[in-house]
Amino acid sequence: MKSRAKSGSVKQWLSVSALSFSALALLPMSIALAAETVSSQAQKQFNFALAAKPLPQALSDFSRVTGQSVVYTDEAPYGLTAPAVNGQMSAEQALQKLLTGSGLSFRRTDSHTLALEPQPTAGALNLGATTITSMRDDSLSYQPPETSSVMRSSASLQEVPQTVNVIPAQVIRDQAPRNLDDALANVSGITQGNTLGSTQDSVMTRGFGDNRNGSIMRDGMPIVQGRGMNATVDRVEVLKGPASLLYGIQDPGGVVNMVSKKPELTPYNALTLRGSTYGDGKNGSGGTFDSTGALGDSGLAYRMVLDHEDEDYWRNFGTLRQTLIAPSLAWFGESTKLLFAYEHREFLTPFDRGTLIDPRTNHPLDISRNERLDEPFNNMEGRSDLYHFEADHELNDDWKAHFGYSWNRETYDASQVRVTSIDTKKGTLTRSMDGTQNAISTDRFTTASLEGKVNVLGMQHDLVFGVDDEYRKIYRADLIRQKSLSTFSYINPVYGREVEGSTVSAADSAQTDELRSDSVFLQDSIHLNDQWILVAGGRFQEYDQYAGKGVPFKANTDSNGQKWVPRAGLVYRYTDALSFYGSYTESFKPNSTIAPLSGSSTVLDGSIAPEEAKSWELGARLDLPGQVTGNIALFDIKKRNVLVANAEGPTTIYSAAGEVRSRGLELDLSGQLSERWSMIGSYAYTDAEVTEDPDYKGKRLQNVAKNSGSLSAVYDFGSVIGGDQLRVGAGARYVGERAGNAVNDFDLPSYTVADAFATYDTQVEGQKVKF
């Protein structure tokens, strides 16, 4: 056995606006100590999800998955079709399946190269000059995989008439994002929404989205835990635009799917130790242990991920502490794969609502960015549990079945000191000692689907259809509302004069938001010929939403209904590497509210139509195997049936009459510019405004930047001193000015964040170590 370590990652956040490489020497970098026991290339296991297609395309996909080159004569594989290959197996096992019935065999020329040759039969082809289809080891590649699980099928992204962005595993390892917002900075058209004091993931895509809106998935199933990004995440996928056909009730911006690390039959063990500092005595430490491998020779494999973080908060007080335990078990049969995973997380995080807008200037208060306006007890403390089960079975070469079940729960208590008013003449604030106790969020999701292909009238139909069932409940038992003991000076702040709130407000407690839904969906990709693909489908969904608050409880939403959501698209494969597409998609989301609507006793029921969105998109996708993947898209989204308040005398009447629109341009590029250079970059122009509303017509949508972009590049020096490896990278992201509220009376300023990292691989006593 040969022992080596798997790559780790280092990332230092140096400033919200600038970074210099000289500062890297002053800040401790993360130290990754890793050791991995590896089999030979012939024994290493890979996860394959390759659809049946022309053999040259299949070989290109094979090289991308394995990082191994396939060489052949110019004419050898052409005119042949490779069968579908799915499941976990070695590169040689997969290639043998791809070559079934082709009259070709292969031999290994070195650890990274396989050569095709004719089987020893009469009339066999003679191999002449070779063509190299891939030369790069995929382990460091910034190029996304050809397929994406967010599409709920094994279809190539070149055949999908909608934007799909993937943040590859190596980008995650290099950048070491602390949360989902950091990871999504690599994707065009995404800004951060209301994170509830930095305690929730809140993603706004193409101008739409919020926290707790059901758009964040783990392995294709929804989660309700506040923060989903952790040491178990391998890569992140984003499906842009309305996604109700695949995911039911959604905002029209899209969905985000975090793909977890899975058990592998190939042994791997890594220990990572981290240290960090913000200066001024604010330090942190942490570590991660990641272990996977086979359990005997029965096809069983395990994975265990342990992670702990304990660090001082970057502002003037606070502690961030979290512990993660995530075991998983998989069984790989000949045609069946089973997966069970569990994740337990305990956390303590500052509940920090940031600064305040000065009403005299409509800009943030002129105080230090380190100064908090709350109290040291302003924290959220809780735990989350996630159970996940999947079963996949290949019925034959053309059809496979999938079953998935997920149960997610998060509980927490939080103190939330809120600013209720400001006196700029005295430089003081009035605050409320608020909080939430015994909050419980739960989501249960079950899905079953079939994917396969049939030929009708000489045309191939790629079908996926299934059923989904979901129950989601967000419940906050006790809401604390307590007046402060004194005013607070933001000019000369003094902390510790207040006590943590304990007065429960019966009228605000028992906050409940409950959703039940059942649906069936179908999608058909019709290959009209070798270049044109027509995609069409729909979802029929029944839903029941119930929400309200108070002791005694008062329902403010009691709505149920049915909805049919269609989707259609057309793809033109100009070449194997370049495709063009156009699509029409829809989404819907029931109108609901926990609190009573202002000035009204209206209960939202079935008479209030759900929000509905329609989107048109035109785009092009470039995919050069072993090099880069790019996507450019033009989109136009209109969402109607937005709740509108209309005053009729002393009464406020609410109706679903409003409309908002978002349109724009997006560009994404990721992959290998050369053997040394890797990059990932994006740009988005988003024009989002209210188009129908008696008060807000013409106003920009809140928190949506017209211009945003990011660019990160990495240079791999290769072998330096004694065979050691050196990689360095840097990047920046920009978010333009955004409307600060619905009435647009102030703007949030633009900002730029720059980052850098460096990794150095060496050997210590035969074990590979990465700094």
Where in this protein do the model-derived segments appear?
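Structural signature of Gram-negative outer-membrane beta-barrels, strongest in the C-terminal barrel
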Residues: A326, A330-F332, S441, Q460-R472, ...
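N-terminal export/assembly leaders
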Residues: M29-A124
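Membrane-embedded beta-barrel scaffold of Gram-negative outer-membrane proteins
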Residues: E390-S406, E410-R418, F580-Y581, A609-Q672, ...
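Outer-membrane beta-barrel translocator/receptor signature
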Residues: T232-D234, L245-P327, W331-K337, D385, ...
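Face-selective signature of the C-terminal outer-membrane beta-barrel domain
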Residues: Y387-E410, M433-G548
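Gram-negative outer-membrane beta-barrel transporters
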Residues: N529-Q531, D636-K638, S655-N741
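Acidic/polar loop-and-plug regions of large Gram-negative outer-membrane beta-barrel proteins
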Residues: E309-Y313, A326-E394, W407-S441, S484-D513, ...
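Acidic, small-polar-rich N-terminal luminal/periplasmic segments of exported/outer-membrane proteins
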Residues: R64, S69, N86, G128-T266, ...
